[in-house]
Each structure stands twice: as structure tokens, then as C-alpha cells.
Amino acid sequence: MRCSCCQKELIKNLTLLELFFQSSHRCFHCQQLFTVIEQKMACPGCGRPNSVELCGDCLQWQKQIGFVLENRGLFYYDAGFRKWIEDYKFTGDYRLRGAFTAELNQALKNYRDYLICPMPLSMERFATRGFNQVSSCLELTNPPFHFLLARKELAPQSEKTRAERLKMEQPFTVKVPKEKIRNQRVLLVDDVYTTGRTLVHGAELLYQNGVKTVKTLTFAR
């Protein structure tokens, strides 16, 4: 057996539960990269850790757009997670897409009646990177997913300041007929929740096109 993150040989005595039920098998080193967010201790809006009431950012969004995203973050966006996303997303180590498949699968069970939609890359960004960092992880999970949105080419989010991200223009268009999503529930999935601007844009557009409910799930917060 190999570590689901670094792919090194993993020497581990499996329990009966691990034999019969899927779990992420990570070596000791890789296990330290991911700190799970305790959902009961997270903001009920954006999922910010250690904020059991709506945080200041969510209250500001509520004033600005009239609703609050219901986001769930799986892991802390800390040094360990940043190391993973640097190696996976920016360096392009595609093997790392399976690092937390079991945790992702478990989280998706809470959205059984939702259309799962990974946040898209622009065609130019996809051509440069060679893969969508979100859909590549979702490919290893059980539920099907759908590309409901398309993205225009804009400057990468990682190159923008917080203020610039918050002022970003609507980068998405809906790529399916309205009839396909009208009165549906949609789960938007992204890698990291930073300001929330990207996910808010996606949610706003879906609501404008008749979607009943939009929730979001991010790998890190």
C-alpha cells in the first residue's frame, strides 16, 4: 500500500474497519499536512474555523448581497495545506489529487440531492496547468459532477490582493440551459475559500438563472 498523498510505500497494520471501509491512508509526514476543521466550531456561513457565530466577513456579505454562503471547509488553510496545494496546483504533481479522497467522499454524502459543480478554470488557464485542480480530485469520489459554469480569462486569483479580489467583476457564465438547473440544488466545490468573492459570483449567477439553493464546499478555509 502507498501513501495517498506522496505515493511512498506505506507500512501500516490495517484494522478490520479500514479493510472494509474506504479511508485515506497517509504516511505520518503527510498526515501532518492536513488539519481537519471541527464543523461545530466553525462559522455557520463561510466555515471559518473557531467562529461559532457568523463572522465579520459573512455579516459584511449579508449587507452587500443580501445572503450568506453556507460553506463547509474540510481543512485549515495552514502551512501544511499550502505546501500540498503548492506542489499539486502550481508545481503540477498530479498524483497528489488523491490525498484526501476519503474525507471528500464523506463530506459529499451531506449533499446527495445536489448537483455537484466544480469551479471552472478559463480555457487559457486549463491549457497552461493541464488539469482542473478541483474536478481532478472529484474524479476519485463517488458522486457524479457537472460543469455548470464557464469562466472568462482574468488575472489569476493568486496574483491579486484581497482588495482586488473583492472588486473582481463577474467571471462566470452559465454553460447549460436554464431548464437544466431551474429549481435545482447546486453544490459549488472549490479548493480554497479566501475572500469568498469567487464563490459568491458563482452563487449569484446560479440564483439569477433559477437555481433554488446554492451551497459551497472547499478543501480548505
Where in the sequence are the language-model features?
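Glycine-rich phosphate/pyrophosphate-handling loop used in enzymes and phosphotransfer proteins
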Residues: 1-221
